[in-house]
Amino acid sequence: MALLKSRLLVGVARCQPCLAAVQGRASSWWSHVEMGPPDPILGVTEAFKRDTNSKKMNLGVGAYRDDNGKPYVLSSVRKAEAQLASKNLDKEYLPIGGLAEFARASAQLALGENCDAIQSGRFITVQTISGTGSLRVGANFLQRFYKYSRDVYLPKPSWGNHTPIFRDAGLEVKGYRYYDPKTCGFDFTGALDDISKIPEQSIILFHACAHNPTGVDPKQEQWKELAALIKSRRLFPFFDMAYQGFASGDTNRDAWAVRHFIQEGINVVLSQSYAKNMGLYGERVGAFTVVCSDAEEAKRVESQLKILIRPMYSNPPLNGARIAAAILTQPDLRKEWLQEVKGMANRIISMREQLVSNLKKEGSIHNWQHISDQIGMFCFTGLRPEQVERLIKEFSIYMTKDGRISVAGVTSANNGYLAHAIHQVTK
């Protein structure tokens, strides 16, 4: 009996550290952390995956698909990859500012090779971690060095990530009217009215082309008026250009607004992404450009951008930048890429036109002209949340509650089904 009691006491003693560990875990450092809300777009994808309907459609995710609904890798990208693989290149770190030939080629693509800022060297472009990284580098740079205002005005609505990017960088996010739900088009009058009241020297963000999420872009004459107003109000423009070439199929046309502002003597900052127009989603290829007053100022800005980037991510990824640089700088690859970009843009334009035509064939009495008037990957359909809910439940057509669809997810095979479903929930 004494031996059994002794063994029990030893066993209890051995368990004391375990009990202490359990108690320690119970009083975790992170017990106060609440569950964050799910990403609305990723939530759409998860629901789509669970659906067993053979006709289901995922119109939530902003990634291009071919007319068979499959991911599309550009031929120019494949050729650039093969070319790079044959060179047996190293995998050394890039400089903080990224691959120099990529950065310069990106600036030339956006601003135009004959742009005065390019010719005089009064710009600096750094490679970034796609468009999101570019926006964050830009936001941090403005937070630290733009001494005139802490307010950044975004179009209403804007890409969902814009607000947290600028807010988390320490800037105050505000808005100006942009989309008119009555016309499903650009609220030009409202935009001019709001912008005219923005305090001078505030920061204002524009989507250079293919506005996300509405697909609504100003016309060139409207851009001219906006530029004149920005200049007279002494506002600071931040352009986000994630879809150059992907909107109209013409890289020069899609960059028109940015180039016009610079021609008018307005120095801008610019974010670029190659996720959509080169299909380099997972490679995370982007650029951030600051147009300066002179070359000496550009050098000072470059030095501070490097200081910002170093503790953020040290240096950007190598492989995607090499691919993009090869495409942008080699005439044969560039020519093929421009044709492929135009092909992707044209497929999306065609899907828009077919959808409008199919809705008419269904007998819809509503005006769906805005679907073909809008541009780029996304379309604001004008559908109400309860109509979207019916599309999901009755037809397995998935989209965000605001009625935004990714036209890239529409194909020749399912266009008619989509039109039929939309007609059923709107008639």
Swiss-Prot record:
Alphabetical list of Pfam families matching this protein: Aminotran_1_2
Molecular function (Gene Ontology), one example: pyridoxal phosphate binding
Keywords noted in UniProt: Aminotransferase, Mitochondrion, Pyridoxal phosphate, Transferase, Transit peptide
The UniProt record lists the keyword Isomerase: no
EC number: 2.6.1.1, 2.6.1.7
SUPFAM superfamilies: PLP-dependent transferases
Protein name: Aspartate aminotransferase, mitochondrial
Natural source organism: Xenopus tropicalis
